[in-house]
Curated annotation (Swiss-Prot):
Annotated source species: Danio rerio (Zebrafish)
Organism classification: Eukaryota, Metazoa, Chordata, Craniata, Vertebrata
Name of the protein in question: Neural cell adhesion molecule L1.2
Residue ranges annotated for the Fibronectin type-III domain, each copy included: 1-64
Record gene name: nadl1.2
Subcellular location: Cell membrane; Cell projection, Growth cone
Gene Ontology CC annotations of this record: axonal growth cone; plasma membrane
Amino acid sequence: EFFIHYLRKDGPDKWEKSEKVNSTQSFYTLHGLQPGSQYRLKIDFNNTKWEQEIQTAGARVMEVKSGFVTESWFIGLISALVLLLLVLLILCFIKRSKGGKYSVKEKEEGQIDSEARPMNNEAFGEYRSLESDNEEKRTASQPSLCEDSKLCTDDGLDDYANSNSVQTEVIMDESLASQSSGVRDVPDAETQESSPLNPATAISHHGLPNSAALLD
């Protein structure tokens, strides 16, 4: 009995051996070989060594080499990262939805304030414009009023002076007329004794002189 050792040339560098083979067998089928591959066969029997390379028949099957991608720890790590990313996305979505509500509310309040502020500014501007217009009208009307009042005052003073002069002339005319009539109406010496030549005996009627004398 003996064993057949075989090695795949394009495979791992590891010799494998078959089951026990009886030397009386005329042929033996070696199982577990890949089709379309080259193998090295080696037989050791009673100090006899035999070695040969063979090519298996059939189409070669492409094998996927195992690496760290197929390892369980790598798959677990990728799954944990995906789960963590999903949790972060959910938290960001919740925060964004809350922030959107607050931002909309603040935006509405800002619009209300901005709408109210221009109205106040416009009303204040209109109030100031009305005040400025009133002041301009007042300043424009004051000189004219002053001029009119000045003219009225000047006219009033002229009228007052004219009326006073007229009254003075009338009073003077009346006094002169009364004096001249008193001089003409003197009948006797008694009247002459009470004339202005004798002031002690002068008699006045109603505050007006009865006679007038011309003194040289």
